[in-house]
Amino acid sequence: LKRELEPAALSGRVILLPLVNPEGFYHGSKQTIPADGQNLNRMFPGKSDGTFSSQLARVLEETLYPEADFLMDLHGGDVNEALTPLIFFPTAVPEKLATQSALAAAALSVPYRVASTSKNGLYSWAAQCGIPALLVERGERGLWSKEEVTACKHNVYEMMEHLGML
């Protein structure tokens, strides 16, 4: 995706974080960070004096959130998960923010959408901080097929279109 995007052709900026938990990814456990066994997506809001996962969550909050007008979190199923493609979007937020996130979710060609009241993940805490956001889940057993990668990239382009970036 990074090689495909032409910054001059975009209205706005795309920030890509291709792998936030590389240690877990390469050890076959994307859900947890091996350093402390915690699920990063349950550590928000982070703490600068907390576990490694909590500190990483805090760094993401401090560096990514201030730069984001919208946050799209892309996940793949871990080794113990078989997922049907779906989107989680926040609803435990002010109505305007919930509507922005729901409309963004509706703009993506993903078959299922889940209205979520979660508050402790990257996307859901971003929404608590005033940033419209959603989470796309796709893949299973720790793997993504070529078709799933293509579909995920297509979703990113759909989101950029929805946001008026293309």
Q: Can you say where each PLM-predicted feature lies in the sequence?
A:
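Structured catalytic-domain cores with a bias toward divalent-metal coordination
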Residues: 1-166
